[in-house]
């Protein structure tokens, strides 16, 4: 009953604010932007835009496309070749680039507003992208209506919406200020894809040059049981040592 009241209130708030407006949604394929896209597409005309860069994995793109088709979302994929500088402000620089692209799309196709899936909890975390959001006047309905991550997960589960594993860009696998090439990104992307043969959920391969650190949210024994093949694969890619982070990676 509490869930139903919360959902009805959220839908009414979205309808009141966005009815008859054309909306571009910054769509990453994560649960926040996915749920927002589903709810807004029931109310008005929407265009979900996924921006594919060399540091966004093909796995993330494919998942985003699959869910867009599953929930009948109007999706546009924009591919760019630029790799932002791997500096402490990389998240801000990335979001700034993304929001600039989305704003140009809004103006080009006469949409009224650009929104993203920022939720209420995000406002209280250290998120450099929030500064870029403010600079481009990007709307955040979940944050505006005080909908946090727990609310989003609850609504998604109750509506039987598939909850994708939490993904971050491939640049987060590297330490700040290290110069990153296309080859570096491809190496990590291919190794994470290789590990999906053994485990489910979120996977991270941290690159410390000669050392690779594997993080997963699935059962660690699935990696340990296949260690010989995994070690060989990683050494084929140039790593001298392969370690497992014993602390389970948590998506949510």
UniProtKB/Swiss-Prot annotation:
CDD domains: LarE-like. GO terms for molecular function: sulfurtransferase activity. InterPro entries: LarE, Ni-pincer_cofactor_biosynth, Rossmann-like_a/b/a_fold. It comes from the Archaea. Belongs to the LarE family. NCBIfam families: ATP-dependent sacrificial sulfur transferase LarE. This is Uncharacterized protein MJ0830. It comes from Methanocaldococcus jannaschii (strain ATCC 43067 / DSM 2661 / JAL-1 / JCM 10045 / NBRC 100440) (Methanococcus jannaschii).
């Amino acid at each position: 009953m509490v869930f139903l009241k919360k959902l009805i209130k959220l839908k009414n708030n979205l309808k009141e604010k966005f009815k008859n407006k054309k909306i571009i949604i910054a769509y990453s394929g994560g649960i926040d932007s996915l749920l927002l896209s589903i709810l807004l597409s029931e109310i008005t005309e929407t265009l979900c835009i996924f921006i594919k860069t060399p540091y966004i994995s093909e796995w993330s793109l494919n998942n985003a496309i699959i869910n867009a088709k599953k929930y009948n979302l109007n999706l546009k994929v924009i591919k760019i070749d630029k790799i932002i500088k791997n500096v402490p402000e990389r998240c801000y620089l990335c979001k700034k680039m993304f929001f600039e692209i989305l704003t140009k799309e809004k103006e080009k196709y006469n949409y009224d507003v650009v929104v993203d899936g920022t939720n209420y909890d995000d406002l209280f975390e250290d998120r450099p992208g929030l500064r870029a959001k403010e600079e481009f006047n990007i709307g955040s309905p979940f944050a505006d209506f005080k909908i946090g991550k727990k609310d989003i997960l609850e609504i998604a589960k109750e509506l039987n919406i598939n909850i994708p594993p939490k993904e971050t860009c491939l640049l987060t696998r590297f330490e700040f200020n290290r110069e990153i090439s296309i080859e570096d990104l491809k190496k990590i992307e291919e190794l994470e894809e290789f590990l999906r043969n053994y485990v489910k959920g979120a996977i991270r391969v941290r690159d410390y040059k000669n050392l690779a650190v594997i993080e997963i949210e699935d059962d660690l024994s699935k990696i340990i049981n296949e260690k010989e093949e995994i070690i060989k694969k990683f050494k084929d890619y140039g790593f001298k040592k392969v370690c497992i982070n014993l602390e389970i990676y948590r998506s949510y």
